[in-house]
Amino acid sequence: LVIGLAVAIGVTLSSEPLDAGLPEGEVTISGDALPEFAGQNDMDIASGLPAPLFSAPNENSEIVSIEKNGNAKALLFLAHWCGYCQTEVPVIQNLINTVGVPNGVEIIAIATSIDRGRENYPPQKWLSDEGWSETQIYDLNREIGTAYGINAFPYWVFLDKDLNVVVRQTGNIPEE
C-alpha cells in the first residue's frame, strides 16, 4: 500500500508541468548580453555598457518591460531557494517601508533559477509572504539572468536613467 501510494504520488508529481503555479508569459530580450560578472574585487567591465532590454511576466502573468522612462533601475535578481536572498528581501522591503524608494528610481525583483523542488516555491508566494511591494518579474528559463551576466545570488544590477550599467554586485547590500 505504501509503495503503491508513493508510485501514485510520483506519477502525479512527474506529470505536472515544470512551471505549474508560475506566472505565464514569454520572456523577450533585445540588445547585447553583458559579460559574466567577475566579482566585487575586479573592475566591472560592464560599467557604462547599455543593458539588454527585456519583457517578462509579473506575478499576475502581465507582461512588464524594462524601458527608458526617465528612471534609474535597481534590478535585484533572486532565487527563491537562496538563503542570502531570503535574508535580503525583508531587509530591502523594510528599507522601502521605512525610507521609501528615491524619486527617479525603480526597484525590480527578478525571480530566476526557479526550481519547484526547492523551498519557497512558487517564488511569487514567497515574495508576497515577505510583503514585497515593488515590481516582480519572472525569468522562467534564466534568460534574463544570463543576459545580465549573473553568477551568484542575490545579484544587483544598477542602471542609470539611460539604462546603462552603473555597477553590479553580488551578495547582500548593507542596510546602511
Place the predicted regions along the sequence by residue.
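Thiol/disulfide oxidoreductase modules built on the thioredoxin-like
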Residues: 70-71, 128-133, 139-176
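Hydrophobic/aromatic anchor residues within beta-strands of the central parallel beta-sheet
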Residues: 54, 107, 135-136
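Cofactor-binding loop segments of dinucleotide-utilizing enzymes, especially the Rossmann-like FAD-
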Residues: 77-79, 110-112, 161
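N-terminal targeting signals for export/organelle localization
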Residues: 1-51
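Structural microenvironment flanking redox-active thiols in thiol-disulfide oxidoreductases
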Residues: 86-130, 140-147
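A short beta-strand-turn-helix
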Residues: 45-48, 53-74
